Curated annotation (Swiss-Prot):
Record's function text: Allows the formation of correctly charged Gln-tRNA(Gln) through the transamidation of misacylated Glu-tRNA(Gln) in the mitochondria. The reaction takes place in the presence of glutamine and ATP through an activated gamma-phospho-Glu-tRNA(Gln).
GO molecular function terms attached to this record: ATP binding; glutaminyl-tRNA synthase (glutamine-hydrolyzing) activity
Cellular component, GO, one term: glutamyl-tRNA(Gln) amidotransferase complex
EC number: 6.3.5.-
Biological process annotations from GO: glutaminyl-tRNAGln biosynthesis via transamidation; mitochondrial translation; regulation of translational fidelity
Chief place where the protein resides: mitochondrion
Protein name according to UniProt: Glutamyl-tRNA(Gln) amidotransferase subunit C, mitochondrial
Subcellular location: Mitochondrion
UniProtKB keywords: ATP-binding, Ligase, Mitochondrion, Nucleotide-binding, Protein biosynthesis, Transit peptide
Transit peptide: 1-31
Catalysed conversion reaction: L-glutamyl-tRNA(Gln) + L-glutamine + ATP + H2O = L-glutaminyl-tRNA(Gln) + L-glutamate + ADP + phosphate + H(+)
Family: Belongs to the GatC family.
């Protein structure tokens, strides 16, 4: 049986596949060893089937932040209560209000960016090879195995827990389920 251990290094992820404890020899690097530039995979774009659309150099922004300051947006209590009810997130603290206002300010900034003619990015890891598994044909009769993973079943179906139920707020400010 295989077990994958992932360690985060500076700007890369290295994976070590361990078959058993005996498979590790004294020459193997410990998992906690720092990742060096020699450990990183050599990724050459030329051999890729599809050339990358990710720019290799950062793009200089045309927007001067000093020239166009975004005004600080204040959110009133009625809007906060509506957002709390719709998103099921409690925004009672000052830090939550500040995070909400910062998010709105960030969205206002990126709204001004011209994206005409820019192809959508479908992954940030275009240069990484995906590990594909072999297709194994089976009889497909795995219903009992699949249903054994469910906590609660009813006849031949999974029973899902109830979803997020929005909270209604009465006139006194107390929140309760509908």
């Amino acid at each position: 049986m295989f077990r994958h251990i992932f360690t985060l290094g500076p700007r890369s992820i290295s994976a070590i596949t361990v078959r058993s404890r005996r498979a590790l020899s004294s020459t193997a690097k410990p998992v906690s060893a720092p990742v060096t530039s020699d450990d990183r995979p050599n990724l050459d774009v030329k051999h890729l089937k599809h050339p990358t659309k990710v720019p290799q150099q950062p793009h200089k922004s045309d927007i001067d932040r000093r020239q166009e300051p975004v005004p600080r947006i204040s959110v009133d209590d009625q809007t906060v209560q509506l957002l709390e009810r719709l998103s099921l997130v409690d925004l009672d603290s000052k830090e939550a209000h500040r995070t909400l206002e910062d998010s709105i300010e960030f969205a206002s900034r990126i709204l001004a960016i011209d994206t005409d003619g820019v192809e959508p990015l479908y992954t940030v890891l275009e240069k990484q090879k995906l590990a594909l598994r072999e297709d194994v044909v089976s009889d497909g009769n795995l219903q009992e195995d699949v249903l054994s993973n469910a906590r609660i079943t009813e006849e031949e179906y999974f029973v899902a827990p109830p979803g997020n139920i929005p909270l209604e707020q009465d006139s006194s400010g107390n929140k309760h389920k509908q």
